[in-house]
């Protein structure tokens, strides 16, 4: 499948910045299930300084922000070819141990609503992969995407109770459910 991605992030500051830095994780890499055909990033208000791989092997871009800056606009335009793999990349050879991704964070800690939602999968005899797919499918049926309905500080439980959220909320709910069910789960990156 060929995917065309156009993405714009705008950051507006309440007062002009005298100095700033920004780390971007907006450069996908080729792997077994995707090939990056074209990928362009345009930065208005900042200058790319260098790239590096973080502890998850994400390609990061380090920016410095222009002096006296009121707004930064980062736009991405790219095309990726993917191979259907049911969402499974395989062994990504993590540098961090899987047990690290079983721990809850304040954002992913499940409350009573998420725990109740997950109970039906606790004793099923399905494969682990099937359970992960069932959870993702049921979250998508239960929670509706609505721009502006949450913030970066909204917990998975709060978004789940509201039955609404944006990409990050779907991810946080999914991670919360999987960790409650005993899986190691972490956010990589991507689009919904």
Can you say where each PLM-predicted feature lies in the sequence?
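Secondary-structure boundary elements
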Residues: 80, 84, 98-165, 173, ...
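Hydrophobic/aromatic-rich core segments of domains that either
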Residues: 21, 137, 169-192
């Amino acid at each position: 499948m060929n995917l065309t991605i156009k993405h714009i992030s705008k950051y507006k500051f309440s007062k002009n910045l005298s100095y700033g830095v920004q780390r971007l994780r907006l450069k996908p890499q080729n792997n077994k299930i995707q090939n990056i055909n074209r990928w362009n990033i345009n930065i208005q208000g900042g200058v790319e300084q260098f790239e590096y791989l973080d502890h998850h092997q994400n390609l990061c871009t380090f920016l410095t922000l222009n002096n006296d800056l009121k707004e930064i606009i980062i736009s991405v335009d790219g095309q990726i070819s993917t191979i259907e793999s049911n969402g499974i990349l395989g062994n990504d050879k993590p540098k961090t141990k899987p047990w690290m991704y079983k721990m809850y964070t304040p954002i992913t800690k499940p409350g009573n609503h998420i725990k109740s939602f997950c109970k039906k999968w606790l004793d099923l005899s399905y494969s682990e992969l099937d359970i992960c797919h069932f959870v993702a499918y049921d979250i998508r049926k239960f929670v509706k995407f609505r721009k502006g309905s949450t913030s970066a500080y909204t917990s998975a439980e709060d978004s789940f109770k509201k039955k609404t959220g944006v990409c990050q909320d779907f991810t946080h709910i999914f991670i919360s459910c999987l960790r409650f069910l005993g899986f190691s789960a972490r956010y990589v990156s991507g689009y919904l």
